[in-house]
Amino acid sequence: MGSFRCMSPASPSWSGLLELLLCGESLSAAQATDLMQAWLSESLTPVQTGAFLAGLRAKGMEAEELAAMAAVLREACPLPCARPDRFLVDTCGTGGDGADTFNISTAVAFTAAACGVEVAKHGNRSASGKVGSADVLEGLGLNLKAPLQLVVDAIPAAGVTFLFAPAWHPALVNLAPLRRSLGVRTVFNLLGPLVNPLKPQAQVLGVAKKDLLDPMAGALQRLGLERAVVVHGAGGLDEASLAGPNDLRFIEAGAIRSLQLSPDELGLATADLETLKGGDLDCNQTILQQVLQGRGEPAQRDVVALNTALVLWAAGIDTDLSSAAARAAEALDQGLPWTRLETLRQHLAS
């Protein structure tokens, strides 16, 4: 009986591309671009789309594929105006760590803004039945249906804004039912943090799996970010953790370097993951409000300060992480991040 051999046709059809994936081969940037454009134009059948999503998930994503697909999605966003001529930073993770923490990266966005960073946070509702950034911010009164122009104008007004992903990526709405029916995480969970339509120059991006550090760092590098940090936290968090050493990739001037960082190196106490637990929507709203007002538990305050320090580095505001963490902790103790959220809420309600 003859053995099956994978073929690599010079100009593969959709079935040819799928065969490449099933054989464990990666797509070129051009092929990844074509595939994403086909998805956006609804040129593929649901069966074909499901097969590609499964094939990419089974193979694993490469930096070149992620960057090519992200570039297509970012260009497809309906911008209400020219991109703001400002140095912007995003704080967004892939999710999927299963740790059920409170909304740490959301707290970080407002804390970084209180420290002088201009933040354009890209986020969505939770896809897992937990509480996503959009869920908790809407619960605290943020208008997710605000006109896109108003969302952009919030940056100079509040120092921070929130880009609700479905409002900026309407072309992906048609794929949502199929993604839900698959019931597993797909490439779109990885693309979410890469497709901020305002194209921030810097970013802190958390990944729940250590083997995603290099592909995501490589994607950010290819997308041309000036400075970025990709972090996989101790205990499997998709953000820096207080539980032990965190694995980091720093991207600066086109180069990537690896680093491990423990909280005690920044003068922060180690803490068990249980101290960072969230709960249902009401619980997470309460925790977020308390943390931003300076009334959070010590571990909640410290984990936000730790992650905010990475944002301050990415923004170029403070390149000494210990000093940056202290600066973030001071802002939290004074309740300054809550003022930023209140200003944003009022702006989006106008």
From Swiss-Prot:
Entry keyword Glycosyltransferase: yes
Pathway the protein acts in: Amino-acid biosynthesis; L-tryptophan biosynthesis; L-tryptophan from chorismate: step 2/5
Catalytic activity: N-(5-phospho-beta-D-ribosyl)anthranilate + diphosphate = 5-phospho-alpha-D-ribose 1-diphosphate + anthranilate
MF terms in GO: anthranilate phosphoribosyltransferase activity; magnesium ion binding
Binding site for 5-phospho-alpha-D-ribose 1-diphosphate: 93, 96-97, 101, 103-106, 121-129, 133
EC main group: transferase
Cofactor(s) this protein requires: Mg(2+)
Binding, anthranilate 1: G93, N124
InterPro entries associated with the record: Anthranilate_Pribosyl_Tfrase, Glycosyl_Trfase_fam3, Glycosyl_Trfase_fam3_N_dom, Glycosyl_Trfase_fam3_N_dom_sf, Nuc_phospho_transferase
Family, as annotated: Belongs to the anthranilate phosphoribosyltransferase family.
Subunit (UniProt): Homodimer.
Protein name: Anthranilate phosphoribosyltransferase
Species of origin: Parasynechococcus marenigrum (strain WH8102)
Lineage: Bacteria, Bacillati, Cyanobacteriota, Cyanophyceae, Synechococcales
